């Protein structure tokens, strides 16, 4: 691969950066969000041109999805170097040069010798076809087609660099299979990703050589044999008779592990940004204190992931209508909630920052791997030699995937902690228990089932966080005595990402439920205040003979009661004597009566005598007004509009409510939470959440707000 800054020598080494640490550091320049935006852009490219050195995670994720419009093209400039290495192998064998995998046996039996190079490659593919598929099309022992497509793309890219001794025509054939959405069937298990992903990759070779046991999946999902696969792909020259080294070139690489790792990391990076935005929305609906995002706090900690996470949250919360309202509430009653928010909110930048750094570092490691030459031996045409080494060892994959999985589990743990606060009326600052949205809390248990499911998801996710790479077994007659387990780790990380999508779905729908409940709360509170004010004016202002009554001074304090009491603590039966509203209103009237002094002895000026009249009038009027306000909300005609429309987080809410067609969940509705979750989950899996997510941050300049 060429030196990134152009400062190279004849041997292909970078003079200024011979160990590539500089290039690795340079790759991490800029914000994580900008990198995610770049990935998304690459994911949407119509054409992916492969040359061996510039393949990206986003491109692999695009091709992995068979429904993608992205087409793969091979850089014609690679043809000459690929041919040169292939010619070198043939020339070397004709001269009788001894070379591993060309004239020798494999692995621990490389002491064996043969001059039948083609037959040796044929046998290699045969004995590596050791996978188990089971019976039936729906067998769970087949690698998903998306992973196979990713592996095919990565393997082409590696072989294009011209160090592997394979014909260009074989790479063109694999490309045709990709572009025509014809996917070889590979076994799910059976590789330790050292020497590369031998067993699964041998099934791609099996299709190319027309092995009778080889199967592929057609564009319509039907299972087909190798002949039909070639026909559908438009490959007309017949099956390949492998030349010396070509079988080894096809199978001895890390493409399956690194291909899957790429698709996993594409999702992981997006989910990491989503978790940052979730934390900001969580702050909004919980009436939190945005002080936790102040740049000085995070600047003094120095960690870039933390600094960026805080800056992203700060941007979402800056100017938020919810934060303006929360500030007024905190000023009205500083003791209504703790001085500091709980850790799930207040330390969310410190928690998410290291996870973002890990995921970002893993992404860069995998991008180096997918652009590497990772087979053995390597053909160095310029020095006229075959180099025997171990680039097939997929340790970067195993380690990166283990680390990513741990980061994913930590993100999930934070989501669970935040969700647990959100649904708990002891912690959620006035929202109803279980986020129940119906009129009767005794017949509406909201997100109770969802909270149980979240606990299940989180538990499984924490289990998956355990490492894979410490379970290595010595293999192949103790020749492969250390091995990376890269694909196994990538598969487990794919599972973890899937579970995090389930958690993200549940949490996002819960956040939108909370947003709607805050909207309902604000309208109900306004209605209660207006009604109490009107009743107070009618009942408390005047005496029997029309004279001004001392109880008229109670109105202001009665309104303060409404400001301080959580609406959902009483609104299902607002005039119940067992609920806090009526108790506090009566307490205010009693306190005023006790301060009324001698006037209480006069029936015309007694405040005590007004209490029953006030309560009786309120019982007649308030329930009707509350119901009218709720009906107006349900009809979309509320007097006060939803504050979310004035917030930077609005695109996500709009997406969930309008694009996926969900609405407020109530016990009065037949629709279950799971039905709504499915809509959002499918949208996330289809990638439709990406644009609304990035829209939330489209005007962020990549820097924290100035310290003032």
Curated annotation (Swiss-Prot):
Q: List the pathway annotation.
A: Alkaloid biosynthesis; Phenylpropanoid metabolism; trans-cinnamate biosynthesis; trans-cinnamate from L-phenylalanine: step 1/1
Where along this sequence does the record place binding of (E)-cinnamate?
Answer: 252, 340, 346, 376, 448, 476, 479
Q: Where is this cross-link: 5-imidazolinone (Ala-Gly)?
A: 194-196
Q: Which residues catalyse the reaction? A: 100
Asked whether the keyword Cytoplasm is assigned, the reply is yes
Query: What is the reaction catalyzed?
Result: L-phenylalanine = (E)-cinnamate + NH4(+)
Q: Where in the cell is it found?
A: Cytoplasm
Classification via NCBIfam families: phe_am_lyase
The entry's protein name is Phenylalanine ammonia-lyase 1
């Amino acid at each position: 691969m060429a030196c990134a800054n152009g400062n190279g020598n004849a041997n292909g080494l970078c003079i200024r950066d011979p160990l590539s640490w500089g290039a690795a550091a340079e790759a991490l320049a800029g914000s994580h969000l900008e990198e995610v935006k770049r990935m998304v852009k690459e994911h949407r490219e119509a054409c992916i041109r492969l040359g061996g050195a510039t393949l990206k995670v986003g491109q692999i994720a695009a091709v992995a999805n068979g429904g993608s419009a992205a087409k793969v093209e091979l850089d014609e400039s690679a043809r000459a170097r690929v041919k040169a290495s292939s010619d070198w192998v043939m020339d070397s064998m004709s001269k009788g040069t001894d070379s591993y995998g060309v004239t020798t046996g494999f692995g621990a039996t490389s002491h064996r010798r043969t001059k039948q190079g083609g037959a040796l490659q044929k046998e290699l593919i045969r004995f590596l076809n050791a996978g188990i598929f089971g019976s039936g099309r729906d067998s769970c022992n087949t690698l998903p087609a998306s992973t196979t497509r990713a592996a095919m793309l990565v393997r082409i890219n590696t072989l294009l660099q011209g160090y592997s001794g394979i014909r260009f025509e074989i790479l063109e054939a694999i490309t045709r299979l990709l572009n025509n959405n014809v996917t070889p069937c590979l076994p799910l298990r059976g590789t330790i990703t050292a020497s590369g992903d031998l067993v699964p990759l041998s099934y791609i070779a099996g299709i190319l050589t027309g092995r009778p046991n080889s199967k592929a999946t057609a564009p319509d999902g039907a299972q087909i044999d190798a002949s039909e696969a070639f026909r559908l792909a438009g490959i007309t020259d017949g099956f390949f008779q492998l030349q010396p080294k070509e079988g080894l070139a096809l199978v001895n690489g890390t493409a399956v592990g690194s291909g899957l790792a790429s698709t996993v990391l594409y999702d992981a990076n997006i989910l990491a940004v989503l978790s940052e935005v979730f934390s900001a929305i969580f702050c909004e609906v919980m009436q939190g204190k945005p002080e936790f995002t102040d740049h000085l706090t995070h600047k003094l900690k120095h960690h870039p992931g933390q600094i960026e996470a805080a800056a992203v949250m700060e941007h979402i919360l800056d100017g938020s209508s919810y934060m303006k309202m929360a500030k007024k509430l905190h000023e009205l009653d500083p003791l209504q909630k703790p001085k500091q928010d709980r850790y799930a909110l207040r330390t969310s930048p410190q928690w998410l920052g290291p996870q973002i750094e890990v995921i970002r570092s893993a992404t860069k490691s995998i991008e180096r791997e997918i652009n590497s030459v990772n087979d053995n031996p390597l053909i160095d045409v310029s020095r006229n030699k075959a180099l025997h080494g171990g680039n097939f060892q997929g340790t970067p994959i195993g380690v990166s995937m283990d680390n990513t999985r741990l980061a994913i589990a930590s993100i999930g743990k934070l989501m669970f902690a935040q969700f647990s606060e959100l649904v708990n009326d002891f912690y959620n600052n006035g929202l109803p228990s279980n986020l129940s949205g119906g009129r009767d809390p005794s017949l509406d248990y909201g997100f109770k089932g969802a909270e149980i499911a979240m606990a299940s998801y989180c538990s499984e996710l924490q289990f998956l966080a355990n490492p894979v790479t410490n379970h290595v077994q010595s293999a192949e007659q103790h020749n492969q005595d250390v091995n990376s387990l890269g694909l196994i780790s990538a598969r487990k990380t794919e599972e973890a990402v899937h579970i995090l999508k389930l958690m993200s779905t549940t949490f996002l729908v819960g956040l939108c439920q909370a947003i709607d409940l805050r909207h309902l709360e604000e309208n109900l509170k306004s209605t209660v205040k207006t009604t109490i004010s009107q009743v107070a004016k009618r009942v408390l202002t005047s005496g029997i003979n029309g004279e001004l009554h001392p109880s008229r001074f109670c109105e202001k304090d009665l309104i303060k009661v409404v400001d301080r009491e959580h609406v959902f603590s009483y609104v299902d039966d607002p005039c119940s004597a067992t609920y806090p509203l009526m108790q506090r209103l009566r307490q205010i009237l009693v306190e005023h009566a006790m301060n009324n002094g001698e006037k209480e002895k006069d029936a015309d000026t007694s405040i005590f005598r007004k209490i029953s009249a006030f309560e009786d009038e309120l019982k007649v009027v308030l329930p009707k007004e509350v119901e009218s306000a709720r009906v107006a909300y349900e009809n979309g005609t509320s007097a006060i509009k939803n504050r979310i429309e004035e917030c930077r987080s609005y695109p996500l809410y709009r997406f969930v409510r309008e694009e996926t067609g969900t609405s407020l969940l109530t016990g009065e509705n037949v629709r279950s939470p799971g039905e709504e979750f499915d809509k959002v989950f499918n949208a996330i899996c289809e990638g439709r959440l990406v644009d609304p997510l990035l829209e939330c941050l489209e005007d962020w300049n990549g820097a924290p707000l100035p310290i003032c």
